[in-house]
Amino acid sequence: MTITEIRNLLQGEVSSEQLEELRADERKGVQKLLISYEKRQAKRAQAVAQFQDRFSYEKKFWQKSQLVAGVDEVGRGPLAGPVVTAAVILPHNFDLIDVNDSKKLSPKKRKELFPKILAKAVSVSVGLANNDVIDRINIYEADRLAMAHAVQGLKVKPDALLVDAMNVPLNIPQVKLIHGDAKSNSIAAASIVAKVFRDNLMDAYGEVYPEYDFKHNAGYGTREHMEALKKYGPTPIHRRSFAPVSEYEK
């Protein structure tokens, strides 16, 4: 085979017999390709092992034939827009190994995984609390309320919840995990769903209020956002209970 043919071969599944033949090929170009291939395989094997480790909490419930939902939120810190939460129930055979804490993934990867999670999950639900609710009951309680709405919106009722660092105000057994989106695939999937949903929502608000650059800042207090607040005052989606916003109320 030519070097190009071997390069193409190593992009897919390779049998042990083929690998033995390539290892016996003394061409430097072939050996370089083999080294790169083996590094990729080792990296993938590590990713698969870590992915399986992130099912350790789920397996405790699966062993008892129980359904468990991962719950996470995004948007506690922004000055504008809602806090968005998601609840996700994953099947035992869930195999999207790239699913991880949404903060560790690029926007492109999150958007790529979003529809795949929706397609493979047993059930997915989104809950949100808008700025009026946040201003009325505070961000922490609004977050908990939105989480409850997300869980209640699931088409299948879970037997238990895995929650990222919060307690959901529902009478369902739950495990609170600090940095849960890095420890549980169910929470990680929920973090991706919530993040992409909120980003899409803030993109839409960016069309309505272009001066505030919501498409790029998602409601966070960037320099451009603060300059627009100073010049134009708050929009109907701003959180007036947040100090920087109230200072620019006209």
Curated annotation (Swiss-Prot):
Positions of the RNase H type-2 domain: 66-250
Residue positions binding a divalent metal cation: 72-73, 164
SUPFAM superfamilies: Ribonuclease H-like
EC numbers on record: 3.1.26.4
Presence of keyword Cytoplasm: yes
Intracellular or extracellular location(s): Cytoplasm
Reactions it catalyzes: Endonucleolytic cleavage to 5'-phosphomonoester
CDD domains per record: RNase_HII_bacteria_HII_like
An MF annotation (GO) of this entry: manganese ion binding
Xref: Pfam families: RNase_HII
Family, as annotated: Belongs to the RNase HII family.
Function statement: Endonuclease that specifically degrades the RNA of RNA-DNA hybrids.
Full protein name: Ribonuclease HII
Native species: Lactobacillus gasseri (strain ATCC 33323 / DSM 20243 / BCRC 14619 / CIP 102991 / JCM 1131 / KCTC 3163 / NCIMB 11718 / NCTC 13722 / AM63)
Lineage: Bacteria, Bacillati, Bacillota, Bacilli, Lactobacillales
This protein's encoding gene: rnhB
